[in-house]
Design a protein with these regions (language model features):
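Glycine-rich loop(s) and the adjacent beta-strand/alpha-helix scaffold that form part
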Residues: 1, 170, 187, 196, ...
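FAD cofactor-binding and catalytic pocket of flavoenzymes
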Residues: 21-39, 43-46, 50-51, 56, ...
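A conserved FAD-binding loop/helix module that cradles the flavin
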Residues: 472-493
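A glycine-rich dinucleotide-binding beta-alpha-beta segment and adjacent secondary-structure elements
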Residues: 6-7, 16-17, 21-24, 33, ...
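A non-catalytic, amphipathic alpha-helix used as a structural packing/dimerization or gating element
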Residues: 76-87, 262, 403-407, 488
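Alpha-helix N-cap/helix-initiation motif
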Residues: 70, 173, 221-224, 229, ...
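Conserved redox-cofactor binding core of oxidoreductases
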Residues: 2-22, 26-36, 41, 51-56, ...
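Short, solvent-exposed loop/turn and secondary-structure capping segments
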Residues: 51-52, 61, 65, 149-151, ...
Length: 502
């Protein structure tokens, strides 16, 4: 019952399949251009299944649209969000190392890194010797506790089991279930309402404010209304935008806050499934300890100035990868196939050859006609309109993918790898599971949906702080940016409430 959820290969395991929706109950439409909308509707949401990589956007990203003459300018810069990145880092716990690179900025509260293994350190040294464009191999910066503890439900250090997709009973990686929800519950001010399908924001024509939300209980199919002074949408880009689109009134016949006509447009993702892997002869007397849930990261090294600028494409990409020396397993050698008893046991626990591989995440530009719409003729089991997607990558992304593939292989070649295999799968929108941009931030209400504090321009007591708000995508995993923007917006909302402005 998950034909679309299983398209990416990310949702194939018995231990994690329940974290993703039943496609028959939650249909969507991608007949024109295939779109992989991978999601789950449960308490904790994607915080249970995210990849946990946390890389900041910088002014290289925030200024890119303006400099390139693409779409519209971001209404914020790094200095506006940097304190809130710090706030989130300190709260959730992020491990990694500082490198002194402006577009891969140092962070105040990094926990001790998992560490690079001997082959990864060899690759790091090789990069510094063989490339003059500033590229480095660093520790992946991921939201895992590696020392001490963090706020939440008794969070402790990572046990190096690498079973994160099952949900971590130790709370070692950040999830809302292990961290923010317990902290919110402890205040005594949280009421959690699971099985609630929010489908509309209630707009008050007299006060010109939102006054609540309408929801359907997925268990009994009854409708309920809840009221509040401030409403935050943070249910992932597509879901939040869908709620805004369904929130129609005399003032907003085309969806709440959609004066600009941009709601649902400028849909972005990160394109990936491009990379290379290879085999390394050497370090045969070395192996690894435990099962790290994170490997290495190669920050962006294209179009960052000077000789790194490319003539075939703008923006850039980064790589995520790992080197390992797994065990032989069953039937990985001729001797295994003919052995039995003690000899077989001896063989299968011998470490295999060293291998390494990395895949790239690249930026997709904000094209206006990459969009989502609602289809009221095709409804789900709760009578709500389904989402129709129409989005493709263009020439800039195709040129970038060619370079991503070439550089992935070249880095392994210069590091002494053999039997190098480079690949590029056909990209389908949504494969990155980083969809964003459908209710973008901007200076001008005529060209954007949200202002610099993530408020809907024309309904100031509604905030949208998930991927929908993004004005460009960068190439970095975006969740840490959503968290920082959410914390910043929540602080702003408290100030505005105290001033009685909303």
């Amino acid at each position: 019952r998950q034909p679309k959820q299983s398209r990416t290969g990310y949702v194939n395991s018995e231990s994690s399949r329940h974290f993703f929706v039943d496609d028959l109950e939650h249909p969507y439409n991608d007949d024109v251009n295939k779109f992989n909308w991978i999601r789950g509707y449960h308490v904790g949401g994607r915080s249970l299944t995210w990849g946990r990589h946390t890389y900041r956007l910088t002014d290289l990203d925030f200024e890119a649209n303006l400099k390139d003459g693409i779409a519209i300018d971001w209404p914020i810069r790094y200095k506006d969000i940097s304190p809130w990145y710090d706030y989130v880092d300190q709260f959730i716990g992020v491990q990694g190392r500082n490198e002194g690179i402006s577009h891969f900025p140092d962070r105040k509260f990094l926990l001790k890194p998992f560490g690079l293994n001997i082959l990864e350190n060899h690759m790091r040294d090789s990069f510094s010797k063989n490339f003059s464009d500033g590229r480095i191999l660093s520790n992946a910066r991921t939201a895992h506790v590696t020392e001490g503890t963090k706020p939440g439900l008794g969070r402790v250090s990572c046990q190096l089991r690498n079973r994160c997709m099952r949900g971590c009973q130790y709370g070692a990686y950040f999830s809302s279930n292990s961290s923010t929800l317990p902290v919110a519950e402890a205040t005594g001010n949280m009421t959690l309402m699971p099985n609630s399908i929010v489908h509309e924001i209630i707009y008050d024509e007299d006060t010109k404010k939102a006054k609540g939300v309408r929801v359907i209980d997925s268990e009994n199919n009854k409708s309920y209304e809840y009221f509040a002074k401030v409403i935050f949408l943070c249910s992932s880009a597509i879901a939040s935008t869908s709620i805004l689109m369904q929130s129609k009134s005399n003032r907003f016949p085309n969806g709440l806050g959609n004066d600009s006509g941009e709601l649902g447009h400028n849909l972005m993702d990160h394109h990936f499934q491009v990379g290379a892997s290879g085999r390394f002869d050497g370090f045969k007397n070395k192996t690894t300890y435990g099962r790290r849930p994170a490997g290495y990261y190669i920050p962006r090294f294209r179009n960052i100035g000077g000789k790194t600028n490319q003539k075939d494409f703008i923006r850039g990409y980064g790589y995520q990868g790992a080197a390992s020396r797994g065990f032989m397993g069953i039937a990985n050698s001729k001797e295994e196939m003919v052995s039995y008893g003690p000899r077989l046991k001896e063989i299968i626990v011998q470490p295999n050859e060293w291998t390494a591989g990395h895949g790239a995440f690249g930026e997709i530009l904000p094209y206006h006609d990459n969009k989502m719409e609602l289809d009221y003729d095709k409804k789900d089991k709760w009578g709500l309109p389904t989402v129709t997607f129409n989005a493709t990558i263009r020439e800039n992304e195709r040129a970038m993918r060619k370079d991503m593939r070439q550089q992935a292989a070249e880095m392994l070649e210069r590091s002494g790898f053999k039997d190098i295999y480079d690949w590029e799968d056909k990209y389908v929108f949504g494969n990155g599971i980083h969809e964003m941009g459908t209710a973008r931030m901007g200076h001008d209400p005529k060209t954007s949906v949200l202002n610099k504090f993530n408020q809907v321009h024309s309904v100031k007591n509604v905030y949208v702080t998930d991927g929908a708000c993004m004005t460009s995508s960068g190439c970095q995993n975006p969740s840490i940016t959503y968290m920082a923007l959410t914390a910043r917006a929540a602080n702003h909302a408290v100030d505005e409430l105290n001033k009685q402005n909303i």
